[in-house]
């Protein structure tokens, strides 16, 4: 197990080299953040316009409906732009030219699969919140466990959608689950390793925002706030790109046995450990 975790960190380090070779991929998660923020703002304006703000807190139907809408928006937009990153990363692994426009076109071609997954994810997420609200304590624990299980089962769903295009939710789930079972240690460590590697930058950005809000004034406050916000957004963007690069490479190895991208310079006998 220790070997799996160490090897996962090696994959993260190698993925940084891939990102440096194609820094333009950062525009995709940045567009995702803008799109999600704009969609949430539109929903918020609609809620205020129709006087539904009070009902969101008092009416279960309205509250869960708003929750479903929020989850569907974040899931659909997130998967769409992640699919674009996966397409670009996969083409780069194959030595082909690619661009953000190519990735967006590929994601658009897979829009039906993305829409289906978004609705499924939003439905499951909403049902878990309903269970939590109706069974305090037990519901919270159950939601946490099921959320974790769902996250692991669907870890490779985006690469499956982009590369396999089966059109079947069951088949996509099975493929994602099988790939995760073959690379679980490396996958988990890579996911956490990316966050840990960028945590100091994120923390610095958050501290700047706090100082700007609490104690700074004038131009100093605006400067710290802008720099802190920029650091936080930058880490979110880089985290998303690296995560998709790693998942794409690990999925290719799990399904085809190919060592591509961040795995290409590593010895597979050292990176992948049989239990």
Label for each model-derived stretch:
Residues 1-275:
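Hydrophobic alpha-helical membrane segments
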């Amino acid at each position: 197990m220790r070997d799996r975790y160490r090897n996962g960190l090696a994959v993260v380090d190698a993925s940084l080299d891939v990102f440096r070779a194609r820094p333009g991929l950062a525009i995709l998660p940045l567009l995702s953040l803008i799109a999600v923020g704009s969609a949430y703002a539109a929903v918020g304006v609609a809620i205020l316009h129709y006087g539904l703000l009070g009902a969101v807190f008092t009416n279960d139907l309205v509250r869960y409906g708003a929750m479903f809408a929020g989850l569907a928006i974040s899931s659909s937009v997130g998967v769409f732009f992640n699919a674009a990153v996966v397409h670009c990363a996969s083409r780069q692994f194959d030595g082909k030219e690619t661009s953000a426009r190519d990735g967006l076109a590929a994601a658009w071609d897979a829009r039906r699969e993305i829409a289906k997954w978004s609705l499924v994810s939003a439905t499951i997420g909403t049902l878990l919140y309903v269970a939590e609200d109706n069974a305090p304590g037990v519901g919270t624990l159950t939601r946490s466990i099921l959320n974790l299980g769902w996250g692991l089962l669907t870890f490779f769903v985006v690469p499956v959608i982009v590369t396999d295009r089966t059109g079947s939710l069951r088949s996509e789930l099975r493929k994602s689950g099988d790939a995760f079972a073959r690379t679980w240690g490396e996958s988990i460590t890579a996911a956490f390793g990316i966050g840990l590697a960028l945590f100091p930058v994120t923390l610095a950005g958050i501290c700047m925002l706090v100082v700007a809000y609490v104690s700074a004034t004038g131009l100093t406050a605006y400067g710290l706030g802008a720099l802190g916000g920029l650091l936080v957004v930058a880490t979110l963007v880089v985290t998303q790109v690296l995560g998709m690069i790693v998942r794409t490479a690990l999925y290719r190895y799990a399904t085809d046995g190919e060592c591509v991208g961040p795995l290409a310079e590593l010895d597979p006998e050292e990176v992948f450990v049989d239990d």
